[in-house]
UniProtKB/Swiss-Prot annotation:
This is Parvalbumin alpha. Residues 37-72, 76-108 form the EF-hand domain. SUPFAM superfamilies: EF-hand (SSF47473). One of its GO terms (cellular component) is cytoplasm. The modification N-acetylalanine is found at residue 1. Belongs to the parvalbumin family. GO terms for molecular function: calcium ion binding. Ca(2+) 2 binds at residues 89, 91, 93, 95, 100. Ca(2+) 1 binds at residues 50, 52, 54, 56, 58, 61.
Amino acid sequence: AKDLLKADDIKKALDAVKAEGSFNHKKFFALVGLKAMSANDVKKVFKAIDADASGFIEEEELKFVLKSFAADGRDLTDAETKAFLKAADKDGDGKIGIDEFETLVHEA
């Protein structure tokens, strides 16, 4: 995922959500450069976040989403993780599919 994004943008985006409780997916996606990407590239980033390659991003993987962008990214709090999941999980199955992720990135 990192090779599709600019290091400066990643740093800026991570700095913006450094404080616990400050994570906002819309702001983060825009700052990190995801929003400007094609659907295809967004799906490549999804695959990088989907650590177990299940085809879904589960709540556990979502907690560590910032680490997919940089090793020093913090863990999301439980509240942030749940809010992120709720925003993305359109079909209510408790996890985020690749199309749900792409929709979430581009709807903001």
